[in-house]
Amino acid sequence: MSQELDYPSSLSAPTSRKAETFSYLPKMTTDQIKAQVEYIISKGWNPAIEHSEPENAFSYYWYMWKLPMFGDTDANVVLAEVDACIKANPNNHVRLIGYDNYAQSQGANMLVKRGDM
């Protein structure tokens, strides 16, 4: 039987915190983020962008960047909005969400930029 290992993550140590899908993997490249956006669009989900200060990310609501991109089918438009959000909020966490209208929930949720801690 394999031994269970403890992961050294703590809310008191900001640099050890993990958040959202893919946070245990290396940072995604622009092409990998674009592939995720294309997946969200291919499922018919509505992309949305949110951001939050790192110190508030785990205990408060995140700010929505504009409105969800209802019916947007161009990944480059979504990526341009992600870049605009990052430029306007350079120290914040930025996440990409795919809202599933049918299930009335989030189909995808991932950090695309980790804020300075």
UniProtKB/Swiss-Prot annotation:
CDD domains: RuBisCO_small. InterPro entries: RuBisCO_ssu, RuBisCO_ssu_dom, RuBisCO_ssu_sf. GO terms for molecular function: ribulose-bisphosphate carboxylase activity. Induction: Both mRNA and protein accumulate at 2% and 0.03% CO(2), but not at 15% or 0.15% CO(2) (at protein level). SMART domains: RuBisCO_small. GO terms for biological process: reductive pentose-phosphate cycle. It comes from the Bacteria. Heterohexadecamer of 8 large and 8 small subunits. Belongs to the RuBisCO small chain family. This is Ribulose bisphosphate carboxylase small subunit 1. It comes from Hydrogenovibrio marinus. The lineage of its organism: Bacteria, Pseudomonadati, Pseudomonadota, Gammaproteobacteria, Thiotrichales.
